[in-house]
Amino acid sequence: MNTMRFHSLTLAALLALGTGAAAAQDFVIYVTNEDSNDVSIIDGASNAVIATVPVGKRPRGLKVSPDGTRLFVAVSGAPKCPPTMDDEECEKLEADLAADGIAEVDTATHAVLRVLPSGLDPEQFDVNWTTGLMYVANENANQASILDVEKGEIVSTVPTGLEPEGVRVSPDGSVAYVTGEVDSDITVIDTATGKEKGRIEVGLRPRDIVFSSDSTRAYISNEVGASIAVIDVAASTVLNTFALPEGSLPMGLVLSQDGQTLYVANGRARTVLALNVVDGAIKSSVEAGRRPWGLAMSPDGSKLYTANGPSNDVSVIDVASFTVIATVPVGSTPWGVWTGPKL
């Protein structure tokens, strides 16, 4: 595979880090809107929506290339089944398999350049920008697809726990973790071989994953378990489980830039929590919108952004005061949120 493009993207991102503090404010926030089939783009300085980009059906997971020129969005033709619908009724709904894929968007023109193959019902994914490989959770197929982004081809698939959702590649690129919601486990993929390395049992209904910057620890949000699992990556074992307050339903996770604080979007509990990574003690809590799901941080670490599905908006949280300083209306049922350079 020709990895020149991905090496250059990484180099461009590193060079951007040296452009000064002012450049840290020149960013945008991308928000996937699952029911309006588009992405809202919010200016990081003004907190105003500056563009809305149609991308395909049910956009959920998203990532931005290191140089900010490409936005990748998981789109899916799988029917949306609310929690109130029983399994038999859901199974009767017809899926639009042709709508499944990863949309690649030019962030300058907002044009969808191509839709990459993804496997059935892609939900979340992550990219190793050094190798150019993308790891995609195929929720309805109970597997992860490994995609060569440059070639636009699926190179292999890996069985996972039932209903995979969260995907994250470790910063050192050695492993990819995939959450299995129903099996309450993590499938560990060895990125060197593209094979399963093992499974780690965590709490009930694991959703999201974040690694420490040195790749020694991983934190998993267990939605139904109302907890955070802390994993020793080298040993593939759970070191600790942080119990969250009663009624918590943790979803999206972000680590502070110094690695000392874990931020948790608490779903239908309508809060965002700040936890001490050593003992899980709650440092701060703030009420956000209805069901904060996706969670992202500004490049300078001073702001958090939550995608609030039922309230169709994004909460902007000032990290220092841990208060909501703005609420930004977006599309219908915002799901995921990510930040990237403003070009």
Give, region by region, the residue ranges found by the protein language model.
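Bacterial N-terminal signal peptides that target proteins for export
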Residues: 1-10
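Cleavable N-terminal signal peptides
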Residues: 10-12, 21-22
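Predominantly soluble domains enriched in secretory-pathway, periplasmic, or organellar proteins
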Residues: 18-343
